[in-house]
Amino acid sequence: MDRIQITDDLSFSQIIYGMWRLGDDTDTSQSHVQAKVEACLAQGITTMDQADIYGGYTAEALFGETLKAAPALRDQIEIVTKCDIVAPVGRHSGARVKYYDTSAAHITASVEASLRDMNIDVIDCLLIHRPDPLMDAMETGEVLDDLIASGKVRTVGVSNFKPWDFSLLQSAMENELVANQIELSATNHTPFTDGDLAFLQENDIPVMAWSPLGGGSIFDNAAVMNVLNRVAGEAGVEPSAVAVAFLLRHPARIAPVMGTNNISRINALSDALKVKLDRQTWFEIYTAALGREVA
């Protein structure tokens, strides 16, 4: 599997395994979580995407049980996690409202909790999960730089940031923001034309695409499915693999974040790499999603 270079000494797999549903599985045993990770590794999927809030602040600890039981796995993977969303559940059950917190104190406490819960010494990439209207860029930028200097975090990036949010935070930092994780799929295609991907390409910033199947909406779109089914039949893969290949075809260095608890589906995640879309086929999918031909 191809790699996406993040820094001189850090790269991500072209497909990333998303762990946001880890706590929703009917089997949350350590052995089952380990089986998922090993199924990913067998295909060259080495990058694991987490967030402190996933599973109501439980998913990192579930993952940590596997890293504690099988510590050799740590050297085979890259761990991405996120912070700044505070929801009134779990460790934040006393909160009165769901909110964002990019204060130095909260980010530092979140990193310490993530390190402890996942049984690791360093986070490979820490993302600010959502833009915070109350973000003091100087304070947030300084604490992110400090976390890198401390050795607790290797790199930092953002998630769901618009170009202006990204530029604001970057202006207050010494280290480079190395990625932006955004919602992107054939059916959620506005980043192709609203400036989001153009900004990231211009600045050579890798893109992590969450919900690359549109939260399942792709399968409800008859026009899109007609094209996906045809191409899937020709390539001998499932339509979902074609939907992922649609993102991989773009030149913006997009790494789809795929989340499933089904081992057989995990085993098929790399099938997207078998699909090579030419320009016309890509536009067939795109125009089917648009509901009209391009101008």
Where do the PLM segments sit?
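Short, acidic/polar
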Residues: D27-C40, T102-M118, W164-S167, F192-G195
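Active-site groove signature of glycoside hydrolases
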Residues: L115-P133
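Alpha-helix N-cap and loop-to-helix initiation/capping positions
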Residues: T28-H32, T58, L62, A95-H106, ...
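N-terminal binding-site loop/beta-alpha segment at the start of enzyme catalytic domains
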Residues: M1-I77
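N-terminal small/glycine-rich loop or linker at the start of catalytic domains
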Residues: D8-D25, V80-K98, L127
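Beta/alpha (TIM)-barrel catalytic core signal, keyed to glycine-rich beta->alpha loops juxtaposed to Asp/Glu
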Residues: P131-A295
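Acidic (Asp/Glu)-rich catalytic clusters
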Residues: T7-D8, T66-D75, L115-N119, I148, ...
